[in-house]
């Protein structure tokens, strides 16, 4: 690798307080300071982030870039274009890196023996109380990390989340970076193109980022549907294997999830009313101390909205049922 091994790229939008924690953590990395730089791209922030960055960017190894709001993919591309390091490490503005995060990403690439894209865990901070749907997200991610560590799952493009990820700068440039037309799931879409270019994937278990995530209920609900539509778009863009995977996974879902999906899918009002009823139930159970039980309700909500997004992208309820349900039950 070059003298400057790593360029850390942090896209940010109106998260000034937690961004300050991210920047402080990057100042305390165990990787020698002369081996990496940090580039922060403010994507149209209006909360004082730009002023914070102006005070922070006091050396050549601290770059602050400001741009009109264009989305996280465009912000990451701008940071990558300004980067000098051989390895790009992407860290989101609400992911506080552990002290050894950069050391572990760098070591994983050197161990790989081939060109790879790496991703590390984003874990729930122990000192933060988050909304129950966000805690469900963390619990779901932790299950996937356990499956990777145990060997039940292999690292794959579907698990590549750019909140804590690393890619050789040359490979990133070769595939054209992030698709700036996408505001959701732009990271997995990039990962599919990296895989097509011959990159492998590696899970960097020790490169821990503490994810100070918080999102509104409306945002969480919208994201689930958007991911379903995104997956169909990716299939049509040249990844037919993904559609086979989605179909194969459907029968493995909880029977209750499948039953509710088959009643609601393709019916927007039914999806909305069912989602809100289950969210209310999940909140009630969570407040009563039944967090693990409440996760079941949030899991059903996420899945019915995801499959609704799939159905809408495919052409509606009938197409979905004919494709996913034996006999096309309506």
Model-derived regions, located:
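A recurrent flexible, glycine/aromatic-enriched loop bordering the glycosyltransferase active site
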Residues: 147-170, 183, 189
